[in-house]
Amino acid sequence: FPGVMGIFGHGNVTSLGHSLEQHRDEIPVYRGQNEQGMGLAAAAFAKATRRRQILICTSSVGPGATNMVTAAGVAMANRLPVLFISGDTFNSRLPDPVLQQVEHFGSPSTSVNDAFRPVVRYWDRITDPAQVLSSLPHLVGMMLDPAECGPAFLGLPQDVAAMAYDYPTEFFTKRVRTVPRSRADEEDLATAAHLIRSSKRPVVIAGGGVHYSLAERVLADVAQRHGLPVVETVAGKSSLLATHPSYSGPLGVTGAAAANAVVTQADLVIAVGTRLQDFTTGSWTLFSSDTQFVSINAARFDALKHGAVAVVGDARETLDELSTLLDDWHTTDEWAAHAATCRIDLDEFVTERIADDGELPLSYAQVVGAVHRAAADDDYVLTAAGGLPGELNINWRSKGIATFDCEYGFSCMGYEISGAWGAAMARPHVQTFALVGDGSYLMMNSDIYASILSGHKFILVVCDNAGFAVIERLQVGQGGNSYNNMLRDSVGPGADVRVDFRAHAASLGAHSIDVSTLDELANALAAARTHDRTSVIVVKVRE
């Protein structure tokens, strides 16, 4: 636990807050501006550290706690470890109802903290100080377990939190915990190897589990050794460099047609560390009806999906052991040639999309291309909901391993800015770039100030198309009328008002600038890298 993100209220300031102040030189506390933003930043931090470090988020009872429920959902959907600690109502119930308490007439032990139950892996309410001796080791073990990883919640009733307790000295002994690497069953490995040897058109789907297993190098070696084309999920993007000969692009709804052309013709899919969500599988329409699946996953729940041959184990170790069984087996020249042709199609497609066509405003793809040119190999790029996930998934050619974060598990608007703060905190020696739409900016922007307050700089590119354009396209494309998505189609006399994002960002302390052309954007990105604090670049884009 390298740090705490906190907003203090009466439910935590006189207990946990007091203790944190006494140990301020040992564990830093970063002041949040919004409890949801804190949680989103902590989730992004966990992803940027590849689940090797965990932040704590603490809030008061009531609205401070419920504000974190959405962030817990993000962490839960993306299998990311975050420890949420909220104040709770009095265990004794003597002062009930306390400030911010929601009363349940027929269930007096229920509080709003019970809302965390569906969105965390581990939930506990500490009703006696001694319970920490049991609860804390269990939740830490869960958050470090690749098969069970996710957020945890502790509720601290205000009277219990204020109690003194003589914890045994050995409870505070320093412990070094290793992330376990489970080994797959030998029979399952043999079955998977047989299926691969028998296949004519195999393809690997690389998911986020590749990153968390630190399996990228092994995946690259195994794919090249056996001639396996590799497509990536959104969470698995940057598992391979875009220049790797086995890289075949991003698949799925937000992916590229060229990559999907490989997947649709595959007779065997080797899914590595992926949940196989609907945007990855096209709601299972991407695959042939007779396609077989081998699923390598630390979590049995995921490995069993879609009737796959489940190989339950650590991705890195399982790929290595599977390659040993395959020995000198290599896929057919015809299949390798098809994948290579699709790869050429993908490169040509992206090159055309990001090129300057002389028209204004710029397209999303052109903005992505400009940021890509400005980024160094080890820089980090981040986005989330709306149209940008598809644009970055297709148009971002990964220059470095594990340098890409698109929150598309919970698809949470607002993750972009808060997440950039957390990622910048996790990777202070590289530049973090975040791309955000105007809708998400308006939904959650206060962590621009949080990043300046804490000194964790990032570069934010705001793509302004005056509304929720991607949902507008879905609305109209499915036969509906344009309504309540674009500003021009919204109800009210202010529908023609455009937000001055540059001025707003400047008011939060950021360097900020408006740009309109690719040259202006390139110059602004170069200047932002030299600035001493967060920079915001605003560009109007096509709908």
Predicted regions and their residues:
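N-terminal alpha/beta PP-like core and its mobile active-site loop of ThDP/TPP-dependent enzymes
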Residues: 1-333, 370, 374-377, 457-460, ...
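Active-site diphosphate/adenylate-binding microenvironment
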Residues: 9-20, 343-429
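Active-site phosphate/pyrophosphate-handling residues
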Residues: 37, 366, 449
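Thiamine diphosphate
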Residues: 74, 93-107, 253, 303-304, ...
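An acidic- and aromatic-residue-enriched active-site/binding cleft used to recognize and process polar
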Residues: 87-88, 386, 439
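Phosphate/pyrophosphate-binding active-site segments
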Residues: 127-130, 153, 168, 294-385, ...
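Short, internal active-site loops enriched in acidic
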Residues: 158-161, 388, 543
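Conserved short loop/turn motifs at secondary-structure junctions
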Residues: 207-211, 359, 437-439
